[in-house]
Amino acid sequence: MFARLANGNVAPSRVIEGQATNLSRTMHGIAYDEINDEIIIPVALSGAVLVFKGDAKGEVPPVRAIQGTRTRLVRPHTVAVDPVNNEILTADPSMRAIVVFDRMASGNVAPKRVISGPKTGLLDIVGLAADPIRNVIIGASRKGNGDQVGLFIFDRLANGDVAPKAFIGGPKSKLAHFRQVAIDPGTGNIFLAQQNTRMKQMEAYVLDKPREGFKLKDDDDDDSDSGRLDTMGFVAVYAPDDNGDIPPRAIIKGPGIRLAGAAGVALNTKKKEIIAVGGNGFQTFLLPDFFRALKKPGSTNQQP
Amino acid sequence: MRRILISTAAATCILLFAGGERSPQANTDGPSEMTALDDLLAEDCIDEVATGIAQAARRLPQEGGVTSDEWPPNAIGGVIPPIRSVSDPFPTFDGIALDTVNDKVIFSDENRHSLLVYDRTAGGASNDPAEPVQYVFGPKTKLGFIAGVEVDPVRKEFYTVNNDSGDLLTVFSYGDHGNVQPRRSLTLPHQSWDVSLAPKRDEMAITVQQSNAISFYKRGATGTAAPIRTIRGLATELEDPHGVYFDEAHNEIITANHGNWTQIRPYSPYDPQTTDVGEYKSGAFHPSAITFHAADANGDVPPLRTIEGDLTGLNWPMGIDVDQTRDEIAVANYGDSSVRVFRRGDRGNAQAVRVIRGALTQIVGPVSVAIDTKNDELWVANYGDHTASVFPRTASGNVRPKRVLRNAPKDTPTCGFTNASAAAYDTKRDAILVPN
């Protein structure tokens, strides 16, 4: 945890770590529940979702842990919280599923709803956000070549093998290798952190087994944040009703600002700040215009 | 680096003020909007440079397209400098490999993605950083979020493993320096963490976190060469394995485990969903442990013995090394910032025979350890303090190190990131939360 005004090379003001926390050193998601003052973390290497008190510090156990055969969790990667409807959502790329639990769920409990199946289009789900005001759930899901890569927008109560109500993705969108997604509850604007514009590369292994027929390429460093100018990442912003193969309505991009590998994005809606994480650091951008209703690109008036 | 960042930002700011035409939208900005921005800036007492950046960013084109690029068309925003930036410009010490033949010590640096080579006698009482005699750094190196490091003193080569960002083992020579291609590379399973060489067998062992596995390769394997055998499965008791030591003297593989376990299934977007996995197994949190497997083990094989339990004090154990003359194992115990030394033959809920821990030791977040039987020393790489500490080989308790090797000036903080890729904002505490 860092003070919002932290700047430069600073140590965190608070750390939760150690054996008793049940955390691992591999976590790719986080959510903060401001109504209930709790921190929610998926632990991919333990098939679990942990909940900590908002002021947790040091080697403290979680107040709740969702884990077990009924949960159907294998490798939960990202997480979101809907404090209005009292739900915790996680996405599991191994299960190709968005899984919704009661916020107070603890132990070996079954999810309330599961969005999964061929109609959903979900595969490598690496970002997740819930908008209780507009009643939608957004999953950021990647695919290698072809198929749908982008933001999958579902009704909040969607359950089972259902098609998304909207989808943002396609060549004009340049969406490819992204991760965390966030929603501004005031406007419904959707923020997405994209590490680079190259599609996810095929890995040499399927878990611990060499992939049959795999051939090395010279540029198999798809997660690299080395800052290739032609494939640099960005933070993209969309309007809540966006749908189809469209470019972002607002964007933060490099070079020169160390945003080559933005993997995470968080919002401070009160201060109109956007926090982008990647490359072993984070940057804060002050952009009040990104927290207004966004008109379609090319329209005569961007402001409401 | 902080200066560079601020300078870059300031230069951008000046450029925007001096050269950028104000967009039509910017010209139409009403006083109330600018006041709102000024209010936001004033509330935080942001310094002059940050204020300039924010005000300049406010004037970026709103309708006329982004001046520096044509994509996306007519979008607001563009190349906008941050008002604040948190990162550590210095290297960190992660893995450590000691070469007492050629008197070198090699560190992996996960933060800046580099390998740093020092004279074995480097370090001392100085508050200043020591200069590496050699480093490998840059895009040609293919170094990503590297973890373990190993050295071959005979061939004068050193190895490291990308834990993330390019699933590779890369090998460099003592003659390599700067932004150079590796002498050879080998594709590895994702989340490989450590490498240990077995010179007599001409093999190497690689731990794989997410698969709870140890994969073995021929030492000179390159490209997409397959492992010659793999220890993996429920019986192995491998649980989020990190440090590994190939103990040829006793024909054992010694592994430090964090205790996280899940029955991983393929998740890559290139793989079909796996449904035929048999009985669904629950994820689990096990205690940290050190496992010992037969060197020839292959498949779902139980360990020969395990050190595990409350008395062990194991807490996120990372790198390990073996003292063959004293028949002991040393482990970098990240969770309580200690080094714990066990008898090599220990099993079960065994207490460490020695623990180096306390304020005087200056051990902070240790990730690796190396034993020097020739010079009677024990090295510790501290991820949390930009240092490596060198102790007498049998040091115990809260003792000062003999010397300290620094990669940054004394008391330089570190952010502690190890591939951070998500964030949340804590509204109650006005804080930014980042998981690693």
Regions found by a protein language model. Give the residues of each.
Chain B
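Structural signal for beta-propeller blades
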Residues: H113-L115, G166-L169, N212-I214, W261-Q263, ...
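Beta-rich, blade/repeat-based domains predominating
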Residues: S87-N102, P139-R155, T187-E203, L234-A249, ...
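Short, conserved, GDST-rich strand-edge loop motifs in beta-rich repeat architectures
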Residues: N257-F285
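Short loop/turn segments immediately following the C-termini of beta-strands
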Residues: E110, R120, N163-D164, Q209, ...
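Short loop/turn segments immediately following beta-strands, especially the blade-tip
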Residues: D119-N127, V171-G178, F216-T224, F292-D300, ...
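Blade/loop signatures of beta-propeller domains
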Residues: N27-I80, A125-S126, G299-D300
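A short beta-strand motif characteristic of beta-propeller blades
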Residues: P81-S87, E131-K140, Q181-L186, P227-L234, ...
